[in-house]
Amino acid sequence: MSLPLTRKDLMIVNMGPQHPSMHGVLRLIVTLDGEDVIDCEPILGYLHRGMEKIAENRTIIQYLPYVTRWDYLATMFTEAITVNAPEFLENIQIPQRASYIRVIMLELSRIASHLLWLGPFMADLGAQTPFFYIFRERELIYDLFEAATGMRMMHNYFRIGGVAADLPYGWIEKCLDFCDYFLRGVVEYQQLITQNPIFLERVERVGFISGEEAVNWGLSGPMLRASGIRWDLRKVDLYESYNQFGWKVQWQKEGDSLARYLVRIGEMRESIKIIQQAVEKIPGGPYENLEVRRFKKEKNSEWNDFEYRFLGKKPSPNFELSKQELYVRIEAPKGELGIYLVGDDGLFPWRWKIRPPGFINLQILPQLVKKMKLADIMTILGSIDIIMGEVDR
């Protein structure tokens, strides 16, 4: 790192990788002139676990439990992209009911991720109360996840061709009750935070990104939409069944930390709208179709009594990934989560490239913090919303 030659008595400060305000194991080498930030160099890789190489030595079903460790606060999205890639590669159609279930789970996971962004973000700014409030709602989402998937965090719920299990009896009513309750919770957050003068002093005109800069840096998600770019893959790519619901893309034009906060608050409201519509319109029918496809290929294939005993434990069948390549993407809470998949007529992917939104969004941090105050670093870093599990992979 080159230091400016014109300044004297510069101080170099290490923030992290074990720092009380750091969002994971991230290290920042910050060069200071008093309180002013002259330079900032992020050091990554402390949580690198070779996720892409592991994928090349596993079948998709064997790899599914690994992917929930990328963004461990929004695990439904990492599962979704992992099963979407082979589904698109082999043109596997999923039942309508399974698609609706996926949308419900994805939007619940989006709310849970935004909540656990909001709490630490406010704690970074010195407000401890919202940090405790967000866990009140987040635990209710975990209760819904646990009832449907058996796990509160690492769900392992999505499958190629559908989902692992149907929604249990009474789950839909509980989900609707949560939606009604959570809308009141969002109003409470806005009354507590949005017009607070201390909060506004910390976030207004801090970390400004223009629309042109956001596009040139490859930013996505709330980082992009807060700079005036109305780009949401749920509207652009129309994956799953998002085109069957009425909702609006949340965006702001100011491009600062306050705009990114407002976008995420608005997204939680829109997620509730999508969930309510999906729950009310959810059709009947199967929740997966790979078993049906497998039995159609075999002559005189039928279930026997012994197999029925293990119906819940039957894994999805493996299949060869044809020799072709494609890029699949979804709108995760932090931005565009993508997979570049190359098949090689084998059970394992030949190449499995992950495009994590947090890694791309983090690259603009040194530019944002230059000429700012030391205290603004945590404001800007918090507004980016990163999880080091997906940044380092």
From Swiss-Prot:
Kindly state which keywords UniProt assigns to this record, in alphabetical order.
Answer: Chloroplast, Membrane, NAD, NADP, Plastid, Plastoquinone, Quinone, Thylakoid, Translocase, Transport
Q: Which GO terms describe its cellular component?
A: chloroplast thylakoid membrane
Q: Which Gene3D superfamilies match?
A: Cytochrome-c3 Hydrogenase, chain B (1.10.645.10)
Which subcellular locations apply to this protein?
Answer: Plastid, Chloroplast thylakoid membrane
Q: What class of enzyme is it?
A: translocase
User: Carries keyword Membrane?
Assistant: yes
Instruction: List the SUPFAM superfamilies hit by this protein, alphabetically.
Output: HydB/Nqo4-like
The Gene Ontology biological process annotation of the record reads:
photosynthesis, light reaction
Q: Which InterPro entries match?
A: NADH_Q_OxRdtase_suD, NADH_UbQ_OxRdtase_49kDa_CS, NDH1_su_D/H, NiFe-Hase_large
Q: Which family does it belong to?
A: Belongs to the complex I 49 kDa subunit family.
Q: What is this protein called?
A: NAD(P)H-quinone oxidoreductase subunit H, chloroplastic
Q: Which organism is it from?
A: Brachypodium distachyon
Lineage of the species this protein comes from? Eukaryota, Viridiplantae, Streptophyta, Embryophyta, Tracheophyta
